[in-house]
Amino acid sequence: DMARNIRGGMPKQTPEGYNRPIDGQPDPWSPFDPKFGGFWEGGTHWSEVVRDDAIEFMGHAKKSENPFFMYIAFNAVHDPRQAPKEYIDRYPLSRIKMPENWLPEYPYKDDIGCSARLRDEKLAPFPRTENTIKVNRQEYYAIAEHMDEQIGRVLENLEKSGMADNTYIFFTADHGLGV
């Protein structure tokens, strides 16, 4: 009987978030600048908005004797890979490791339908460089950690509410292609 905060869809995509960074050129994108919209739409990070919605929902659900169903859709770690600056700073590029199987271009990409026209392949320019891979990983790690902390706050609130022992939690995701 209670539906709240129905928020559908993905954050607004901006062209500056794709095909970057290009070595030797200034990066037009900043993962922590709200001017690019995306996860910063309205000035608050989307994962924090979703967290607050979930906590508010649990407050209403606690007042009822009936069981409740809550579906929380964190769009992170999806692109655009945006996180607060403090999270980006936790992952200096000098400490980001390159995958052992890294190639500037995957030789069979066209054969498997993974051409440069595919949206996830537009996240970085071809040929890929070590700097590009490290920047993309830095942003991915930062947004993943930020989302993880928001989920932790939801779980802390669930524990404090006294409803945790009578709650099932299912965590699923469809992310990872762009990393």
Residue ranges: model-predicted function:
Residues 2-179:
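Active-site-proximal cap/lid insertion segments
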